[in-house]
């Protein structure tokens, strides 16, 4: 029998070895993705002539649509504003010379919109699906105090969860027939841990992450890549960030980096600064992360409510 001191030494040594091995593997993985890798999946017409992007008129969705068009893919844009859809479609055709198609659909509605989307996509050889459409809270809030809570619950489920499942249901069979295709599901870093004061949003994005990773495991042997994309803050209308920075990139910068991870990571934070933040959070105890998130969101909530009071 080892004396207590000897046992503690071996426990410490094994713990240090585990940490060193984990750190080395993490470093190798990071080099593979951010240093050497350029994305195994050649996102372009070789996967199929068309890319389909939901929530395509702003932010990350618009950036994906333009990046895929730049790679030679025709793009089907789906969003609720016909005016914005036509504007983005015009920009894409003018800049990249590819065919576009617009489908007007409000994902906050019930399931009947999917018959219209199905009809709009009929006959298209779809190689890439970007499930980007999503909504969040207007500001962090305690669940029961969320404004118009019942409506918010319905919309959050319909837009953040139902759309991902239904769009995948429409597009995946055609990909399976050709044994190739890529589905990019835009989740959020808020789905990596329960996020107090954004609880419903966080839970909906955790669903997207689990759905994506499970689907990838089911269909990767059949030539289908499914990726969960989990950004931190990006300078978009939804995030209310107008000035980009190193850790809060423009949608275009973020998407260029994220596309490079396709085929290398089934779950990605998308760009190097966000990957670093994800790594830092991953080594912290869950309780610590949740306490930090609670503190941060309480501060954001207080600032929002104070500003709202001044405007009255």
Curated annotation (Swiss-Prot):
It is found in: Endoplasmic reticulum membrane. InterPro entries: NAD(P)-bd_dom_sf, Sc_DH/Rdtase_CS, SDR_fam, VLCFA-Steroid_DH. One of its GO terms (molecular function) is very-long-chain 3-oxoacyl-CoA reductase activity. NADP(+) binds at residues 48-77. PROSITE patterns: ADH_SHORT (PS00061). The chain crosses the membrane at residues 33-53, 181-201, 274-294. The gene is HSD17B12. Pathway: Lipid metabolism; fatty acid biosynthesis; Steroid biosynthesis; estrogen biosynthesis. Substrate binds at residue 188. Brain. It comes from the Eukaryota. SUPFAM superfamilies: NAD(P)-binding Rossmann-fold domains. Disulfide bonds: none annotated. The active site is at residue 201. It catalyses: a very-long-chain (3R)-3-hydroxyacyl-CoA + NADP(+) = a very-long-chain 3-oxoacyl-CoA + NADPH + H(+); 17beta-estradiol + NAD(+) = estrone + NADH + H(+); 17beta-estradiol + NADP(+) = estrone + NADPH + H(+); 3-oxooctadecanoyl-CoA + NADPH + H(+) = (3R)-hydroxyoctadecanoyl-CoA + NADP(+). GO terms for biological process: estrogen biosynthetic process; fatty acid biosynthetic process. Belongs to the short-chain dehydrogenases/reductases (SDR) family. 17-beta-HSD 3 subfamily. Its EC number is 1.1.1.330, 1.1.1.62. This is Very-long-chain 3-oxoacyl-CoA reductase. Catalyzes the second of the four reactions of the long-chain fatty acids elongation cycle. This endoplasmic reticulum-bound enzymatic process, allows the addition of two carbons to the chain of long- and very long-chain fatty acids/VLCFAs per cycle. This enzyme has a 3-ketoacyl-CoA reductase activity, reducing 3-ketoacyl-CoA to 3-hydroxyacyl-CoA, within each cycle of fatty acid elongation. Thereby, it may participate in the production of VLCFAs of different chain lengths that are involved in multiple biological processes as precursors of membrane lipids and lipid mediators. Keywords: Endoplasmic reticulum, Lipid biosynthesis, Lipid metabolism, Membrane, NADP, Oxidoreductase, Steroid biosynthesis, Transmembrane, Transmembrane helix. It is a multi-pass membrane protein.
């Amino acid at each position: 029998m080892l004396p207590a001191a000897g046992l503690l030494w071996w426990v410490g040594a094994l713990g240090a070895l585990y940490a060193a091995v984990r750190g080395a593997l993490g470093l190798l993985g990071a080099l593979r993705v951010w240093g050497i890798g350029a994305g195994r999946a050649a996102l372009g017409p070789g996967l199929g002539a068309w890319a389909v992007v939901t929530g395509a008129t702003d932010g990350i969705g618009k950036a994906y649509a333009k990046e895929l068009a730049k790679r030679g893919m025709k793009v089907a844009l789906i969003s609720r504003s016909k005016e914005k859809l036509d504007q983005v479609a015009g920009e894409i055709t003018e800049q990249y010379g590819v065919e576009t198609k617009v489908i007007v659909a409000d994902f906050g509605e019930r399931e009947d919109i999917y018959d219209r989307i199905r009809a709009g996509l009929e006959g298209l050889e779809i190689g890439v699906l970007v499930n980007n459409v999503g909504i969040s809270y207007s500001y962090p809030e305690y669940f029961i105090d969320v404004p118009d809570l019942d409506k918010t619950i319905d919309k959050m489920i319909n837009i953040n969860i139902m759309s991902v499942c239904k769009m995948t249901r429409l597009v995946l069979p055609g990909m399976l027939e050709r044994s190739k295709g890529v589905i990019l599901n835009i989740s959020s870093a808020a789905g990596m841990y329960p996020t107090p004061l954004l609880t419903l949003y966080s839970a909906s994005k955790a669903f997207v992450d689990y759905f994506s990773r499970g689907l990838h495991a089911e269909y990767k042997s059949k030539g289908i890549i499914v990726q969960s994309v989990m950004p931190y803050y990006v300078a978009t209308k939804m995030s209310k960030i107008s000035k980009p920075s190193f850790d809060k990139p423009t949608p275009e910068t973020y998407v260029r980096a994220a596309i490079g991870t396709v085929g290398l990571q089934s779950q990605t934070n998308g760009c190097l600064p966000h990957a670093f933040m994800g790594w830092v959070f991953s080594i912290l105890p869950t309780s610590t992360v949740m306490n930090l998130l609670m503190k941060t969101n309480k501060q954001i909530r207080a600032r929002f409510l104070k500003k709202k009071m001044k405007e009255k």
